[in-house]
């Protein structure tokens, strides 16, 4: 146990090589928060007794009740360790960020990852790698974050499932292999090989609930002394196909009669024997073992029996805190090392300006550059700490800084505030400590700048500094709810509350429809539910009436327009000719993932479009814009030749395109995956007759006409559902999915367990209350996990009278208070 003073912490903060910024990531319920307790307990912020039950990082009342982590919290830990590099024992400061595993909160995970350099990936030994593990690990690797693995809940394998040592070994190898497959798929050459290997010490095994864990390195240290070999040699032997023959006392690569796998014999068997002797109450046997292991029980602990005794003994022998902190300190990078290869991903500006150099060297004397990844609510309602990480320079109380929002461009005035920082604070889970200043490489909370930032942003002192790239979220908000106050007089309170809500959660989108409705969009039912609850109790503190959840749709086309569409301007002097066609498969997703974007070099982009998607080279060079919001998955291509004055109307056409793609023709939803071709333009010679007022509405009309003639269709969002359940309830799962238009595309039994893993696609529109219904159908044995996966075409032509799709379109139009009928083509198409 260590009791800190702020001065001591501040002293280590100045040594970037002794800092580790890391987060704990895992699938929901794989025991992340419980494990974090062992770490916090070791670093001396909770009293030792509470570990395993305290769930220290779950700071909100609803997290404690629901037993899930919703917001990610940061805690600083202190640990002394000898890295065996000749410098002796050194103090380390570990900034730990516990992040949620539930998929609806994966925006929180993204925010947590941006400010860390390493990740502890937790996987349940019995359940293995699940969908959320994969999603989060993929996000981590995209951010160039180095992983280490902890295989958790080994106590289940020993006590519930009573596995033998060899079964456990086979199971461990399978889990590690699955993790490494994901790592090698998504990793980056610049980081080198980041796969995890037990024999290199980057994998630990243990139980968060019982508070014990071990790495191969830990046992290798013990046996290396005993056998008189080097530790590194011993580590190689204790894993993989190395067998020990007790008669000849030799290690072999192949299994001979009488020899056993070294991992099983030297590591798993002693643990299994200790478990069984304690659980069977064989006192003579386990007391002798404890003497050999050097574990001494003191005072009250001597009277313990059964599980409490087991927990105590394992904690004393293989303390989880020590093992994990050792692994973190030894195998995760310090900011000084990590920022060298992360700077390209993080910094938007040129890689050789003073800020980029400061980040690369993690230099406390360079100009300040800090990224605020999220807003943390303070104890007084409605104010927030800006939580983030200093990448370069030093941030101090009272310092005058430039607060740059995500839309800031160097040299511009938009989204820029110059203000003083009132206080800098250390975030300690439930507590906050004041600190005078914080140098590069550390995480920090700032007071007094929350009103100038919406969700995230960059804080600098250099006038030339660019932004740190804003975060890419892996989930898109597809579930929306309209909210209104129960008493209309309280509308202003609701509006204020919505502003605070959108600050506190990186992924919520709060908007106001033209009808005056206030909409909250989230990425799943649970997410929206928590947001509404926050809004009602915390931010607005009024009674709220929420509508049923509404699903966002997208509009697209499936053919090339069957005619060239023409629209004339209101003064009849200008004509625009256009067609629409679908974008090639895969390009839409590439645009959404940012692989093809308006910021790319036009030459490189046109080569990619030509080689991969068969675009015409000339057309690919003449893409005018992407939309909606200038980055969306629709493009406008200029295929005209030799038109006078064309450049003058380009901006007007672009704004018409943004407008048209934001509110599609069928039911004013966003368009997706459409390519508009501008074929020909006839313009009036006088500039005064071809201004924005003439061109913009005309261009929008011709786009609507082009979309209507190209077989318009609706797209609906689909969830990927992953369900693990026992074999006997599979029938109930299929029945529930079939009632809701879901279809199963993958089912496999999990080896070594009675569980079956099922993956299915389920339309978001039919996913509400799915969890509740599924639990009822399977008597609570099936656990679904939904994550937005893709947009699926709805079969059926919305223009066909009486079709189901037409009904759907009408329903959406009714909800939006616009005329029910889809406007006729004649409204948009003009004759010559």
Curated annotation (Swiss-Prot):
Catalysed transformations (reactions): GTP + H2O = GDP + phosphate + H(+)
Tagged with keyword Phosphoprotein: yes
Annotated tr-type G domain residues: 17-336
Xref: Pfam families: EFG_C (PF00679), EFG_III (PF14492), EFG_IV (PF03764), GTP_EFTU (PF00009), GTP_EFTU_D2 (PF03144)
Positions of modified residues (Phosphothreonine): 57, 59
Keyword terms, alphabetized: Cytoplasm, Elongation factor, GTP-binding, Hydrolase, Nucleotide-binding, Phosphoprotein, Protein biosynthesis
SUPFAM superfamilies per UniProt: EF-G C-terminal domain-like (SSF54980), P-loop containing nucleoside triphosphate hydrolases (SSF52540), Ribosomal protein S5 domain 2-like (SSF54211), Translation proteins (SSF50447)
Subcellular location: Cytoplasm
Gene Ontology cellular component annotations, sorted alphabetically: cytosol; ribonucleoprotein complex
Documented EC number(s): 3.6.5.-
Residues reported in the UniProt entry to bind GTP: 26-33, 152-155, 207-209
InterPro entries named in the record: EFG_II, EFG_III/V, EFG_V-like, EFTu-like_2, G_TR_CS, P-loop_NTPase, Ribosomal_Su5_D2-typ_SF, Ribsml_uS5_D2-typ_fold_subgr
Basic and acidic residues composition bias: residue spans: 593-608
The UniProt record lists the keyword Cytoplasm: yes
Domain of life according to the entry: Eukaryota
Modified residues (Diphthamide): 689
Renumbered residue ranges of the record's region Disordered: 580-608
UniProt GO molecular function: GTP binding; GTPase activity; ribosome binding; translation elongation factor activity
Top enzyme class: hydrolase
Protein's job: Catalyzes the GTP-dependent ribosomal translocation step during translation elongation. During this step, the ribosome changes from the pre-translocational (PRE) to the post-translocational (POST) state as the newly formed A-site-bound peptidyl-tRNA and P-site-bound deacylated tRNA move to the P and E sites, respectively. Catalyzes the coordinated movement of the two tRNA molecules, the mRNA and conformational changes in the ribosome.
Family: Belongs to the TRAFAC class translation factor GTPase superfamily. Classic translation factor GTPase family. EF-G/EF-2 subfamily.
Protein name in UniProt: Elongation factor 2
């Amino acid at each position: 146990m260590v009791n800190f003073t702020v001065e001591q912490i501040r002293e280590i903060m100045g040594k970037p090589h002794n800092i580790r910024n890391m987060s704990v990531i895992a699938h929901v319920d794989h025991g992340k928060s419980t494990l974090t307790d062992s770490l916090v307990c070791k670093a001396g912020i909770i009293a030792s007794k509470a570990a395993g039950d305290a769930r220290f990082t779950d700071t909100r009342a609803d997290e404690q009740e629901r037993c899930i982590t919703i917001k990610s919290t940061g805690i600083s830990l202190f640990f002394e360790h000898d890295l065996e590099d000749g410098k002796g024992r050194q103090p380390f400061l570990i900034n730990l960020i516990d992040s949620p595993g539930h998929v609806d909160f994966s925006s929180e995970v993204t925010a947590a990852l941006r400010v860390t350099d390493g990740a502890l990936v937790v996987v349940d030994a019995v359940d293995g790698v699940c969908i959320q593990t994969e999603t989060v690990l993929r996000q981590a690797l995209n951010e160039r974050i180095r992983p280490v693995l902890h295989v958790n809940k080994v106590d289940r394998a020993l006590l519930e499932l009573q596995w033998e040592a060899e079964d456990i070994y086979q199971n461990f190898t399978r889990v590690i292999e699955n993790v490494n497959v994901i790592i090698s798929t998504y990793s980056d050459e610049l980081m080198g090989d980041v796969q995890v290997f037990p024999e290199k010490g980057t994998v630990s095994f243990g139980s968060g609930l019982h508070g014990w864990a071990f790495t191969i390195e830990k046992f290798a240290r013990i046996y290396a002394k005993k056998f008189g070999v080097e530790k590194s040699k011993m580590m190689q032997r204790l894993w993989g196909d190395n067998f020990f023959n007790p008669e000849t006392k030799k290690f072999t690569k192949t299994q001979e009669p009488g020899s056993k796998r070294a991992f099983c014999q030297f590591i798993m068997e002693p643990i299994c024997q200790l478990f069984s002797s304690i659980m069977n109450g064989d006192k003579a046997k386990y007391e002798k073992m404890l003497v050999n292991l050097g574990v001494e029980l003191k005072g009250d602990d001597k009277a313990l029996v059964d599980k409490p005794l087991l927990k105590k003994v394992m904690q004393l022998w293989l303390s989880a805190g020590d093992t994990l902190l050792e692994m973190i300190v030894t195998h995760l990078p310090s900011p000084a090392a990590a920022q060298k290869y992360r700077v390209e991903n993080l910094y938007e500006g040129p890689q050789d300006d003073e800020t980029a150099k400061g980040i690369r060297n993690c230099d406390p004397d360079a100009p300040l550059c800090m990224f605020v990844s999220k807003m943390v609510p303070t104890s007084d309602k409605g104010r927030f700490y800006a939580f983030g990480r200093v990448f370069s320079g030093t941030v101090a109380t009272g310092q005058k800084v430039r607060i740059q929002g995500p839309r800031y461009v160097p040299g511009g005035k938009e989204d820029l505030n110059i203000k003083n920082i009132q206080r800098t604070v250390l975030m300690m889970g439930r507590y906050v400590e004041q600190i005078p200043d914080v140098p590069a490489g550390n995480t920090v909370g700032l007071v007094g700048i929350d009103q100038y930032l919406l969700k995230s942003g960059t804080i600098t002192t250099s006038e030339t500094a660019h932004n740190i790239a804003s975060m890419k979220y892996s989930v898109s908000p597809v579930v929306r709810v309209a909210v209104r106050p129960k008493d209309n007089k309280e509308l202003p309170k609701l509006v204020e509350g919505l502003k605070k809500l959108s600050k506190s959660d990186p992924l919520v989108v709060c908007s106001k429809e033209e009808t005056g409705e206030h909409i909250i969009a989230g990425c799943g039912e649970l997410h929206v539910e928590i947001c509404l609850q926050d809004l009602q109790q915390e931010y607005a503190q009024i009674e709220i009436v929420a509508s049923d959840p509404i699903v966002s749709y997208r509009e697209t086309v499936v053919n090339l327009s069957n005619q060239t569409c023409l629209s004339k301007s209101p003064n009849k002097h200008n004509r625009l000719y256009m067609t629409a066609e679908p974008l090639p498969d895969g390009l839409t997703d590439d645009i959404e993932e940012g692989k093809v974007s308006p910021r790319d070099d036009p030459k490189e982009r046109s080569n990619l479009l030509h080689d991969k998607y068969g675009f015409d080279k000339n057309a690919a060079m003449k893409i005018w814009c992407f939309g909606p919001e200038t980055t969306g998955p629709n493009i406008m291509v200029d295929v005209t030749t030799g038109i006078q004055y064309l450049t003058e109307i380009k901006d007007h056409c672009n704004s018409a395109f943004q407008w048209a793609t934001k509110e599609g023709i069928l039911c004013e939803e966003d368009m997706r995956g459409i390519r508009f071709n501008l074929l020909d333009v006839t313009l009036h010679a006088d500039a005064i007759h071809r201004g924005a007022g003439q061109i913009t509405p005309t261009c929008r009309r011709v786009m609507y006409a082009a979309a209507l003639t190209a077989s318009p269709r609706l797209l609906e969002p689909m969830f990927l559902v992953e369900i693990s359940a026992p074999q006997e309830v599979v029938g109930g799962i299929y029945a529930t999915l079939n009632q809701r238009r879901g279809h199963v595309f993958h089912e496999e039994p999990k080896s070594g367990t009675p569980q079956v893993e099922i993956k299915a696609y389920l339309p978001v529109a039919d996913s509400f209350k799915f969890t509740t219904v599924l639990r009822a159908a399977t008597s609570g044995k099936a656990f679904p996990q939904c994550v937005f996966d893709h947009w699926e075409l709805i079969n059926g032509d919305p223009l066909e009278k009486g079709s189901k799709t037409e009904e759907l379109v009408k329903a959406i139009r009714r909800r939006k208070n616009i005329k029910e009928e889809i406007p006729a083509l004649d409204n948009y198409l003009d004759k010559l």
